[in-house]
């Protein structure tokens, strides 16, 4: 609550009004109220097409509740706007209908206050659907004034810090978060309909594994051990495949102690899925289905627009090997066998920076990221990643330098990552050991050896296809949001000084 010494004039007046309510026997912060219409949209859907004459004749009485965000009129009659989670609806208050005492209470109330309204549905001469109040109930006092209704919150920092004010003043933002929930429901429905079981795995882990990322570290006092916030759910979910669950998915929060930009937040939602007897081609089909389900929430024809570019999810997504993509863009042919020295020379000649510990596969991946990725517009599967950057993916049978892995790219950004999963425990141990060596050579994001996971693989894991989808990025895409912060209700922020 605001320090009494720092109250502005409006806040002082509102506190005086709060006390006046108490003096009149009116609770400034009420208890339960029972509207018979949950949403203003219910009223609009039911009565919008009725004529004013018909509505007057029917005398349809409703009870609604919400925040007053506008008030107009003088004398003994006023109009006001009520905001609930369905949107805005107008109500009309007359002293001779609600009584002098109630009308005085209404006139003295402020924008931001909550009211319950009972009355009949009418249309004004301008044709606006309106609830004509027969009874009004004061529900809750707002002690701070709302932002200007015409301009809302202008400071992006305040939008993210005070999301509640953004939701009140920016209907587009409010509806974006409603759409987010609908998209997640549609994705879950698709997974459930295709025989996947939703599961939950630990957020606190003894070892940070499943991705190349820097973890958050915490301490468990009772066990007196350091633990890690999970950076992926992969290895837990694959243990469940070993256990016979066959098709599983988890949609939940991941934590990575890394940088922040319009596409990255330290905590974010992903969905990982694993299906026994799938290979990465099957997972491509699954991925298409997931994105079509999401696009269907916002566009019946599965064609959406993101930042001015139309994207078509109605057709099959293009598929292209990473090496072929590089060759198309640069003319360089990485299908040819080469030494790391030869690869480094190609990198030097083309302005590609590299680390001292990089192998040929790392340089191939860097060429793709630097020369190809930003050119990819429509949904496309890039497959065949080098072994060096895919420690958990199955080696391709035809060329052991590459893996049966793909990523989905749209408008130059990665939206999904998938493999034919590595199920050979001996190969898996070798790759973990190679990652440990990279860590020793300076790659602080390389994965440690997860002995328990290797042991699980030794009991046998069937051929499996796995997928990871960034849910926040997907929602950004489908709702035309510029930043990941626009689809997270409470994004990570530096504390206010």
UniProtKB/Swiss-Prot annotation:
<dbReference type="GO" id="GO:0000287">
    <property type="term" value="F:magnesium ion binding"/>
</dbReference>
<dbReference type="GO" id="GO:0000049">
    <property type="term" value="F:tRNA binding"/>
</dbReference>
<dbReference type="InterPro" id="IPR018149">
    <property type="entry name" value="Lys-tRNA-synth_II_C"/>
</dbReference>
<dbReference type="InterPro" id="IPR006195">
    <property type="entry name" value="aa-tRNA-synth_II"/>
</dbReference>
<keyword id="KW-0479">Metal-binding</keyword>
<dbReference type="Pfam" id="PF01336">
    <property type="entry name" value="tRNA_anti-codon"/>
</dbReference>
<dbReference type="InterPro" id="IPR002313">
    <property type="entry name" value="Lys-tRNA-ligase_II"/>
</dbReference>
<dbReference type="GO" id="GO:0016740">
    <property type="term" value="F:transferase activity"/>
</dbReference>
<keyword id="KW-0547">Nucleotide-binding</keyword>
<keyword id="KW-0030">Aminoacyl-tRNA synthetase</keyword>
<feature type="binding site">
    <location>
        <position position="414"/>
    </location>
    <ligand>
        <name>Mg(2+) 2</name>
    </ligand>
</feature>
<dbReference type="GO" id="GO:0140096">
    <property type="term" value="F:catalytic activity, acting on a protein"/>
</dbReference>
<dbReference type="InterPro" id="IPR004364">
    <property type="entry name" value="Aa-tRNA-synt_II"/>
</dbReference>
<dbReference type="Pfam" id="PF00152">
    <property type="entry name" value="tRNA-synt_2"/>
</dbReference>
<dbReference type="GO" id="GO:0006430">
    <property type="term" value="P:lysyl-tRNA aminoacylation"/>
</dbReference>
<dbReference type="GO" id="GO:0005524">
    <property type="term" value="F:ATP binding"/>
</dbReference>
<protein>
    <recommendedName>
        <fullName>Lysine--tRNA ligase</fullName>
        <ecNumber>6.1.1.6</ecNumber>
    </recommendedName>
</protein>
<dbReference type="InterPro" id="IPR012340">
    <property type="entry name" value="NA-bd_OB-fold"/>
</dbReference>
<feature type="binding site">
    <location>
        <position position="407"/>
    </location>
    <ligand>
        <name>Mg(2+) 1</name>
    </ligand>
</feature>
<keyword id="KW-0963">Cytoplasm</keyword>
<keyword id="KW-0648">Protein biosynthesis</keyword>
<dbReference type="GO" id="GO:0004824">
    <property type="term" value="F:lysine-tRNA ligase activity"/>
</dbReference>
<dbReference type="InterPro" id="IPR044136">
    <property type="entry name" value="Lys-tRNA-ligase_II_N"/>
</dbReference>
<comment type="similarity">
    <text>Belongs to the class-II aminoacyl-tRNA synthetase family.</text>
</comment>
<comment type="subunit">
    <text>Homodimer.</text>
</comment>
<dbReference type="GO" id="GO:0005829">
    <property type="term" value="C:cytosol"/>
</dbReference>
<dbReference type="InterPro" id="IPR045864">
    <property type="entry name" value="aa-tRNA-synth_II/BPL/LPL"/>
</dbReference>
<keyword id="KW-0436">Ligase</keyword>
<feature type="binding site">
    <location>
        <position position="414"/>
    </location>
    <ligand>
        <name>Mg(2+) 1</name>
    </ligand>
</feature>
<keyword id="KW-0067">ATP-binding</keyword>
<keyword id="KW-0460">Magnesium</keyword>
<dbReference type="InterPro" id="IPR004365">
    <property type="entry name" value="NA-bd_OB_tRNA"/>
</dbReference>
């Amino acid at each position: 609550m605001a320090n009494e010494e720092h109250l502005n004039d409006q806040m002082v007046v509102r506190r005086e009004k709060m006390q006046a309510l108490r003096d009149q026997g009116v609770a400034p912060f009420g208890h339960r109220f029972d509207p018979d219409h949950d949403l203003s949209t219910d009223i609009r859907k039911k009565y919008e097409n009725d004529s004013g004459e018909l509505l007057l004749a029917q005398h349809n009485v409703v009870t609604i509740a919400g925040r007053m965000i506008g008030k107009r009129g003088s004398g003994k009659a006023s109009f006001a706007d009520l905001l609930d989670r369905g949107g805005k609806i107008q109500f009309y208050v007359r002293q001779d209908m609600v009584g002098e005492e109630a009308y005085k209470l209404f006139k003295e109330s402020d924008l931001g206050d909550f009211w319950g309204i009972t009355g009949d549905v009418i249309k004004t001469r301008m044709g606006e659907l309106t609830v004509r109040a027969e009874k009004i109930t004061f529900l809750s006092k707002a002690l701070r004034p709302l932002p200007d209704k015409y301009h809302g919150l202008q400071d992006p920092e305040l939008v993210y810090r005070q999301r509640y004010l953004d939701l009140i003043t920016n209907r587009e933002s409010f509806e974006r978060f409603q759409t987010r929930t609908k998209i997640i429901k549609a994705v879950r429905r698709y997974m459930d309909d295709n025989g996947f079981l939703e599961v939950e795995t630990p957020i606190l882990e003894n070892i940070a594994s499943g991705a190349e990322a820097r973890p958050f570290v915490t301490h468990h006092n009772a066990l007196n051990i350091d633990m890690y916030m999970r950076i992926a759910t992969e290895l837990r979910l694959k243990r469940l495949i070993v256990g016979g669950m066959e098709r599983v998915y988890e949609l939940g929060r991941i934590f990575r102690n890394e940088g922040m930009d319009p596409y990255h937040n330290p905590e974010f939602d992903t969905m990982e899925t694993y299906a026994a007897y799938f290979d990465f081609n099957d997972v491509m089909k699954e991925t298409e289905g997931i994105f079509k389900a999401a696009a269907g929430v916002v566009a019946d024809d599965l064609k959406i627009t993101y930042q001015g570019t139309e994207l078509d999810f109605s057709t099959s997504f293009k598929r292209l090997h990473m090496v072929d993509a590089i060759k198309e863009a640069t003319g360089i042919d990485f299908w040819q066998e080469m030494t790391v020295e030869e690869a480094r020379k190609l990198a030097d000649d083309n302005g590609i920076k590299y680390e001292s510990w990089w192998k040929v596969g790392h340089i191939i991946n860097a060429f793709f990221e630097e020369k190809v990725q930003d050119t990819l517009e429509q949904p496309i599967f890039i497959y065949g990643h080098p072994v060096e950057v895919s420690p958990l993916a199955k080696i391709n049978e035809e060329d052991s330098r590459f893996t049966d892995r793909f990523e989905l790219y749209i408008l130059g950004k990665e939206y999904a990552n998938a493999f034919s999963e590595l199920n050979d425990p001996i190969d898996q141990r070798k790759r973990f050991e190679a990652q440990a060596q990279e860590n020793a050579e300076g790659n602080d994001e390389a994965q440690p050896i997860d002995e328990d996971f290797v042991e699980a693989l030794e009991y046998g894991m069937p051929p499996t296809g796995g997928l990871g989808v960034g849910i926040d990025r997907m929602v950004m895409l489908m709702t035309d949001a510029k930043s990941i912060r626009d689809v997270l209700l409470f994004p990570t922020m530096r504390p206010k000084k």
